[in-house]
UniProtKB/Swiss-Prot annotation:
Species name: Sulfurovum sp. (strain NBC37-1)
Annotated catalysed reactions: L-histidinol phosphate + 2-oxoglutarate = 3-(imidazol-4-yl)-2-oxopropyl phosphate + L-glutamate
Keywords: Amino-acid biosynthesis, Aminotransferase, Histidine biosynthesis, Pyridoxal phosphate, Transferase
Organism ancestry: Bacteria, Pseudomonadati, Campylobacterota, Epsilonproteobacteria, Campylobacterales
Protein name: Histidinol-phosphate aminotransferase
Binding partners and assembly: Homodimer.
Enzyme type, top EC level: transferase
Pathway the protein takes part in: Amino-acid biosynthesis; L-histidine biosynthesis; L-histidine from 5-phospho-alpha-D-ribose 1-diphosphate: step 7/9
GO biological process: L-histidine biosynthetic process
Length: 364
């Protein structure tokens, strides 16, 4: 069978290793596995969400409200925008897919930082587009504008806070990049971890309303991180109505499940779970910073729910990741991104205790 030629240059996305894999390969009991690889919320599921799922388990045979009216209403109140400014996806990943399919072809190019979310490249390559990267993982105005003028990309991706590095770009710098490009280039501002950045430093906080005046900008958000709904797959894009209307032409019917829709609506009602998640994170990440300093390890200042450790020539990220995996500790090796480092989700106090104990033994 002959497949589309563009597939020859696409690598399959590699998700964080699941607990089940460690159980199968190393015979470690599930309760003894500590997964700090996928930036999941360590608190778990909001009890209010669990209640909604249990109360509605008997309607799984019904299709959801395809207009997603209640969720759009909830998001419009949350972000002070109109329903017509919102598109819902099965995770913000799906909105990225809509964007690529709507705008890109084999004559297009896209611009992103040297190290950033892998799905930008994958979705662009699926459409045959060329990938342009800046020199650094940081979203620097000079680098982006120079590349923009050289290549005239159809899409610019600004992931802030950035995954997998954890750094953030200031609101001022983001707006400067946006205002430095013309309206034929779409700027995607991916705020998947924005709740963490906003809690740490308002200078790096970006709200959808900061961007809505630009006709060529879309803001992406998700319920997967601070809201703890990674397994429910709900994300959204917020932009001017004209852009949203065009993206809707890419959306399949019933792209959000009935239960996912209901729990996302519930998640918008109360911020206490998000606040508790961020409070735990802010408390525990200090331990990772202290541990790194005490052990001579470099790290990138994080505005997310994870931290990135960078190693010198005396340590190897692949060897460390593999050794920890055999001990039942799952972290994300960044070798595939060209970095000698690892990304570690900030867990609970108990999970972090386990990580520090095993990591110290491995590096010694």
């Amino acid at each position: 069978m002959k497949f589309n030629k563009v597939l020859e240059n696409i690598q399959t996305y590699e998700a964080g290793k699941p607990i089940e894999l460690v159980v199968r390969e190393f015979g470690i009991a599930p309760k003894d596995v500590v997964k700090l690889a996928s930036n999941e919320n360590p608190i778990g599921t909001n009890p209010a969400i669990t209640k909604v799922i249990r109360s509605n388990a008997d309607i799984a045979h019904l299709y959801p409200d395809d207009s997603m009216f209640e969720l759009k209403e909830a998001l419009s109140r949350k972000f002070d925008v109109e329903d017509e400014n919102i598109i819902i996806g099965a995770g913000s990943d799906q909105v990225l897919e809509f964007i690529s399919r709507a705008l890109l072809n084999e004559a297009s190019s896209v611009l992103m930082s040297a190290v950033t979310f892998a799905m930008y490249e994958i979705y662009a390559k699926q459409m045959g587009a060329k990938i342009i990267r800046t020199e650094s993982y940081e979203h620097k105005y000079d680098e982006f504008i120079e590349a923009y003028h050289t290549y005239k990309p159809k899409i610019i991706y600004i992931c802030t806070p950035n995954n997998p590095t954890g750094d953030a770009t200031s609101r001022e710098e983001v707006l400067k990049i946006i205002e430095g490009v013309d309206k034929d280039t779409l700027v995607v501002v991916d705020g998947a971890y924005m709740e963490y950045a906003a809690a740490k430093d308002q200078k790096h906080a970006i709200a959808p309303t900061d961007l809505l005046k630009y006709e060529n900008v879309i803001y992406l958000g998700t319920f997967s991180k601070a809201h703890g709904l990674g397994g429910m797959r709900v994300g959204y894009g917020i932009a001017q109505a004209k852009l949203i209307k065009e993206l809707y032409k890419m959306r399949p019917p019933f792209n959000i499940t009935t239960l996912s829709l209901l729990v996302a609506i519930e998640a918008c009602k109360d911020d206490s779970f998000v606040e508790a998640s961020i409070a735990l994170h802010q408390e525990q990440i200090k331990r990772y910073e202290t541990f790194a300093k005490e052990n001579g390890i470099s790290y990138i200042e994080s505005y997310t729910n994870f931290i990135t450790y960078l190693f010198d020539e005396n340590l190897d990220s692949t060897q460390i990741s593999d050794a920890l995996l055999k001990r039942g500790v799952i972290i994300r090796n960044l070798a595939s991104y060209g970095m000698n480092g690892v990304r570690i989700t900030i867990g609970t106090e108990v999970q972090n205790d386990v990580f520090f104990r095993h990591f110290a033994e491995v590096i010694s």
